[in-house]
Amino acid sequence: MIRKRMSAYLTAGVACLAVPFGAHADNMDDLVAAAKAEGQLTVIALGHDWCGYGALVQSFKDKYGLTVNELSPTGGSGEELTTIKANIGNNGSQAPDVIDVGLVFGPIAQKEDLLQPYKVQTWEEIPATAKDPEGHWYGDYYGVLSFVVNKDVISKSPADWADLLDPAYRKSVSLPADPRTANNSILSVYAAGLATGAQPGAAAARAGLEFYRQLKDSGNLVSGFGSAASIAKGETPITTRWDSNGITYAENFRGNPPLDTIVPKSVTVAGVYAQAISKYAPHPHAAKLWMEYLYSDEGQLGYLKGLCHPIRFDAMRKSGIITDDMLTKLPATGDNLVFPELSHLVKAGEVIAKEWTSTVGAGSK
């Protein structure tokens, strides 16, 4: 198992490879003018309480005067790729210009020829381990997988993965979404497998599937997925979510109900998300401008305000743009945070998508 502190991961290999000029950052004045001529940007799966996207979208609109069409705000990464494919040749409002997907879905989309390359001006500050060298996709932020717990329902919060099997948590544990298509659920299963001591990759994926089978057989796994609403209602009182989700929900709920956001003691994973431009984007210049905005200091700080860890974190810390007082709301992770290798994630995602139904199925006992 590879364990790395955040800054060590983010400084690993920032050298970039040369690609044709057209894939590099455009002149900003020309890009802004071209984007304004298009007049619109279509995004997908950007919930307003996810990593500060509500404020980021509004700031982008205010800054550049573009209309932003928002599709399926609660959609998963797999749905984003499906939506691109379903709208090839459609230049209307249902065709996304850009996507924000779990890192494992970047290479999948590239392999399916759904993306066009583009390198933002801050390209060299994005770690080589979190980007395609040609610029088809690259990490934008990451979250730390945690347990989000409704304290009105659960008096003693779980501290680690094995605790979830406690009979006290009957009909209490949920995944955040469909693990066959959603990045946060794939990584929930994967992290549970790593916590058993399984080797990274397919072995950890299968160990995680077995763990969730045990949760189901014990009656602890509920059939529904853990949304903000279901957590608040007590329908999914223990849900695996990113740390940013739990903290944001707690702020929005204002103590009704009170929530705990707990980083598992033994092992947890960092979930890197990736931004990319659709090869079939109806508004390609607006898409490039959106990318430039997200990877600028302003955009990266927007992620941090939304309690997600920006991908340019290390460079921005070194330059003093990110200061200690900006990090006080983020839960401590210690040395138990794992940044999974992309090859392991790809294999794990394939195994979980293929074997979830046969191993775990759906619903509680």
Task: Set out the residue ranges of the language-model regions.
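Mature extracytoplasmic/periplasmic domains
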Residues: V269, Y273, S278-L337
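Bacterial N-terminal signal peptides that target proteins for export
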Residues: M1-T11
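Extracytoplasmic ligand-binding site segments that recognize negatively charged/polar headgroups
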Residues: I44-Q58, L71-K85, G92-E235, Y249
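N-terminal signal peptide c-region/cleavage motif recognized by signal peptidases
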Residues: P20-G22
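Periplasmic-binding protein-like
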Residues: Y142-L145, L209-Q214, N220, R254-K279, ...
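Immediate post-signal peptide segment of exported/extracytoplasmic ligand-binding proteins
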Residues: H24-T42, K61-K63, D166-A168
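Conserved C-terminal helix/tail region of periplasmic/extracytoplasmic solute-binding proteins
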Residues: A229, G334-K365
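Non-transmembrane alpha-helical segments in soluble domains
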Residues: V32, G106, A162-L165, G193, ...
